[in-house]
């Protein structure tokens, strides 16, 4: 798996899924997960972006609350994911996104796309 560790400005370390394209990158995209974590769906989006020439990085936005959280889409998993949102802090989330952007900044222009949690 293509995991890396990011360090936010406040010193917190979080995991991110990162994929690089073959050849010179066209830029980079930060992929903000759904409430289900950096699961296989989010990883597949990153993989497709890399196939199209972009460095793609998906920081694990729940690592501060529930490290390595990822789930599927059953009603029980939806309930669990929604419960995590009660503890989600936007200020620290922005620090984590900034760390992700910094990790891929050498690829050129950096965009961001969000799904559910970040959409």
What is the predicted role of each segment?
Residues 1-119:
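N-terminal cap/leader regions of alpha/beta-hydrolase-fold enzymes
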């Amino acid at each position: 798996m293509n995991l890396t560790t990011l360090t936010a400005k406040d010193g917190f370390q979080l995991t991110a899924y990162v994929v690089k394209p073959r050849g010179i990158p066209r830029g980079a995209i930060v992929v903000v997960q759904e409430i289900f974590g950096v699961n296989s769906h989010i990883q597949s989006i990153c993989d497709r972006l890399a196939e199209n020439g972009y460095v793609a990085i998906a920081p694990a936005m729940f690592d501060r609350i529930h490290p390595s959280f990822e789930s599927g889409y059953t009603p029980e998993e939806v309930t669990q994911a929604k419960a995590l949102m009660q503890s989600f802090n936007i200020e620290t989330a922005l620090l984590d996104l900034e760390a992700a952007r910094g990790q891929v900044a050498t690829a050129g222009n950096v965009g961001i796309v969000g799904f559910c949690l970040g959409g």
